[in-house]
Amino acid sequence: MEKQRLKAQLSSLRVPLFSVPWPGQCSNKAEVIEARMMKWADEHNLLVTDEYRNRVIRTRYGLLAARCYPNAGEVLLQAIADYLVWFFLADDLFVDRVEVATDETIRNLTAMVDVLDLNVAGSPPVFGELAWLDVCQRLRRLLQAETFERFAQGMRLWATTAALQILNHLRPTSVGIREYQTIRRHTSGMNPCASLADAANKGSVQACEFYDADVQTLVRQTNNIVCWANDIQSLRIEIHQPGQFRNIVTIYAQQGQSLQDAVETTATRVNKEIAGFCELADAVTARPISDELHGLIDGLKYWIRGYLDWVVHDTMRYADQFIESDADDRRFSAPDLSLLKKKLLVCD
């Protein structure tokens, strides 16, 4: 009933564009990174069917990496691009575009945490686990130990707060805005992405600067800007998902607003967050800070602008014409590992 009421308002929905007062950038290795990412995803059996491969091709996750980390060295940028394609596919197949909870949900998510904690894959591995292990081992080699642990902690929280998101979708109505924001802050994957922003620019920030209250506020504002803008931009397809569909817009609608008013309320909050980020970033960079912290703040700006540009110029992930085919991944969920093993034998 909740979904049907929301779907009825989609045809007239107007989605706003967002702007920020700094230019976008993109690595000149973007197309090479994208091609290698597709090859890597294929080699790690993430592209479960030709239909799924075509979807990933038109989504352009390598371009997202190139826009958000334009100054990263080629080896690090490739690892980040491979991480992003893995993350989006795992998030879709484990949480978002399948049933709210399945027999495999706990096993899938705990396997991802175990890779971080134990640095090995289970036997037998779940879908995507070997790809995830490969990404983590590459990042361990490329990053300082502290930086990798920031990334790893963000990913542990992604896997564990996914359970809170599932619990919210098992309720007849959603939790409120405050509780949702807490869940969204960690299930989005933005914290691990932000933790790579310094290494991809001028090097790793020391803990005393990274955990400074103002710096953490900038990280949180970056998270909020990307997440809440995404809640608007992905609204049409998320409402058609079989499992997870509640977000900040639908919660405002649940509280009595029309869907259009809920979008505008959310957009106002995004723009306010952008203004707050700009003001605080200017204040922090006016202080005597390290080059690495300057690089981190630049990296947060790259992420905000890079994500917004990716949505407008590159990706078809949220395109209306693919909603019917892309919103429901139940036919792809829990791919048969024996079939993947046979595929590997054929390739060998």
From Swiss-Prot:
Annotated protein name in UniProt: Sesquiterpene synthase MGU_11447
Gene3D superfamilies in UniProt: Farnesyl Diphosphate Synthase
Source domain of life: Eukaryota
Free-text function comment from the UniProt entry: Terpene synthase that catalyzes the conversion of (2E,6E)-farnesyl diphosphate (FPP) into sesquiterpenes which are important for fungi-environment interactions. Produces a mixture consisting of 8 sesquiterpenes including corvol ethers A and B, as well as traces of epizonarene, gamma-cadinene, delta-cadinene, alpha-cadinene, alpha-cadinol, and an unidentified sesquiterpene. Produces both corvol ether A and corvol ether B in similar concentrations.
Motif position, DDXXXD motif: 91-96
Family indicated by similarity: Belongs to the terpene synthase family.
Note on domains (UniProt): The Asp-Asp-Xaa-Xaa-Xaa-Asp (DDXXXD) motif is important for the catalytic activity, presumably through binding to Mg(2+).
Binding site for Mg(2+) 1: 91, 96
Record-annotated site: Plays a critical role in the stabilization of intermediate cation: 88
Transmembrane segments: none
Catalytic activities: (2E,6E)-farnesyl diphosphate + H2O = (+)-corvol ether B + diphosphate; (2E,6E)-farnesyl diphosphate + H2O = (+)-corvol ether A + diphosphate
Residue sites binding Mg(2+) 3 per the record: 230, 234, 238
Residue numbers binding Mg(2+) 2: 96
Site residues, Plays a critical role for substrate recognition: 92
InterPro entries the UniProt entry points to: Isoprenoid_synthase_dom_sf, Terpene_cyclase-like_2
Chain positions recorded as substrate binding sites: 184
Keyword Transmembrane annotated: no
Organism: Metarhizium guizhouense (strain ARSEF 977)
Cofactor note: Binds 3 Mg(2+) ions per subunit.
UniProt keyword list: Lyase, Magnesium, Metal-binding
Pfam families for the chain: Terpene_syn_C_2
